[in-house]
Swiss-Prot record:
Source species: Neisseria meningitidis serogroup C (strain 053442)
Predominant cellular place of this UniProt entry's protein: cytoplasm
Keyword list, A-Z: Aminoacyl-tRNA synthetase, ATP-binding, Cytoplasm, Ligase, Nucleotide-binding, Protein biosynthesis
Catalyzed reaction equations: tRNA(Ser) + L-serine + ATP = L-seryl-tRNA(Ser) + AMP + diphosphate + H(+); tRNA(Sec) + L-serine + ATP = L-seryl-tRNA(Sec) + AMP + diphosphate + H(+)
Protein name, per record: Serine--tRNA ligase
Gene from which this protein is expressed: serS
Residues holding ATP: 268-270, 355-358
Subcellular location: Cytoplasm
Top-level taxon: Bacteria
């Protein structure tokens, strides 16, 4: 959520920065609500002053035996009390409208973010690794994976489209990838592993920015036997739960940075994705991801963003996968991000790079929604900065390993770094 004081003092500048990311800020509406709020506040202050003044007179009037005048003054105070209650209700209504609107406004792009309308104007930062040249006709991950235990038909039978069953060697490889990622982040990069709920309340999703704007992208659930029919949600990413562990808290500055990681399933309705990536694992309703989150001092957040990109890159390098890093332009960034880098892995069968990680600095946007603060060296409470990144999406990493390390006979070479997690197995072969 944006700083309301920044909006009040720099409305035009904020509107211009939001326009760069394709959001039209209604300055006239904001100014009208602000005028309404100010008018109610002025009226409230005048009523309070009048009440206090008249209340002081009542005792004096009674002492002078002026009982009728004292009663009239008491009647005035009673009316003022009613007027104050109405003013409080009016102010609350205006404030609620402002707050609800603020929750729907995206973050401001950082000054270093390239301007652009959509993904076609993202900027490549670097490429690492050279895509392999095959001397045989390659297969995609579907044709490679099905003989090894990848079962799309079984997933569809159980749950519908965009669900998958894995068994045998593929299931083991999928598990090994997640364990390798977790071990790398905890043992080499200094993150603390977490296990968090997969079902959350709306306030939790509001804290990280998925609600209220993106409700259609979420899976909604209700408890059996719950007469209130309270809606909860399956998490779209462990970013939600990891980041919210610091909601409504004040962290001593010496404890920063907090580095959190978790392996979890992610559930997404993929609203608006009809017809996209219908074949294979690239776009699923349920997929696993190892998430990285850091809670940091505001002055350290952009340094931390570069560090987190490096942590995700280390996984790709260890798995011997070609990839590139791109900076998202203003028109392609996520709702809560001030700056985002995407890591895209080479997918041979598609002859292109596909997103496998997204690392974002949200600055204080989420922290303001969550009331996540730290106590600085002067004893003042300030908002932390929050960052998140995929480290990595497990299913897409599986796709990349299958396709980049395939052999002509359909077998798959296991990268050396992954072999200890596969019980020493160096190759997947159709049995």
């Amino acid at each position: 959520m944006l700083d309301i004081q920044l909006l009040r003092s720099n409305t035009a500048a904020v509107a211009e920065r939001l326009a760069a990311r394709g959001y039209e800020f209604d300055a006239a509406r904001f100014n009208a609500l602000e005028e309404q709020r100010k008018a109610v506040q002025v009226k409230t202050e005048e009523l309070q002053a009048s009440r206090n003044s008249i209340s002081k007179q009542i005792g004096a009037l009674k002492g002078q035996g002026k009982h009728e005048e004292a009663q009239a003054a008491m009647d005035q105070v009673a009316q003022i009390k009613t007027d104050l209650e109405q003013a409080a209700a009016d102010l609350d209504a205006v404030q609620k409208e402002l707050d609800a609107w603020l929750l729907s406004i995206p973050n401001l792009p950082h000054e270093s973010v390239p301007a652009g309308k959509d993904e076609t104007e993202n900027v490549e930062v670097r490429k690492v690794g050279t895509p392999r040249e095959f001397d045989f006709e390659i297969k995609d991950h579907v044709d490679l994976g099905e003989p090894l235990g990848l079962d799309f038909e079984g997933g569809a039978k159980l749950s519908g489209a965009r669900f998958t069953v894995m068994r045998g060697q593929i299931a083991r490889l999928h598990r090994a990838l997640a364990q390798f990622m977790l071990d790398t982040h905890t043992l080499q990069h200094g993150y603390t592993e977490h296990y968090t709920p997969y079902i959350v309340d709306d306030t939790t999703l509001q804290g990280t920015g998925q609600l209220p704007k993106f409700a259609e992208d979420l899976f909604h659930v209700t408890r059996g036997g719950d007469e209130t029919k309270t809606t909860q949600y399956l998490i779209p990413t462990a970013e939600v739960t990891l980041t919210n562990t610091v909601a409504d808290s004040i962290i001593p500055s010496e404890q920063l940075p907090l580095k959190l990681t978790a392996h979890s399933p992610c559930f997404r309705s993929e609203a608006g994705s009809y017809g996209k990536d219908t074949r294979g694992l690239i776009r699923q309703h349920q997929f696993d991801k190892v998430e990285m989150v850091q809670i940091v001092h505001p002055e350290k957040s952009y340094e931390t963003l570069e560090e987190m990109v490096g942590h995700a890159e280390n996984i790709l390098k260890a798995l011997e996968l070609p990839y590139r890093v791109i900076t998202l332009c203003t028109g392609d960034m996520g709702f809560g991000a001030a700056k985002t880098y995407d890591l895209e892995v080479w997918v041979p069968a598609q002859n292109t790079y596909r997103e496998i990680s997204s690392c974002s600095n949200c600055e204080d946007f989420q922290a303001r929604r969550m009331k996540a603060r730290f106590k600085d060296e002067n004893g003042k409470n300030r908002l932390v900065h929050t960052l998140n990144g995929s480290g990595l999406a497990v299913g897409r990493t599986l796709v990349a390993v299958l396709e980049n390390h395939q052999n002509a006979d359909g077998s798959i070479n296991i990268p050396a770094a992954l072999q200890p997690y596969m019980g020493g197995v160096a190759k997947l072969e159709v049995k």
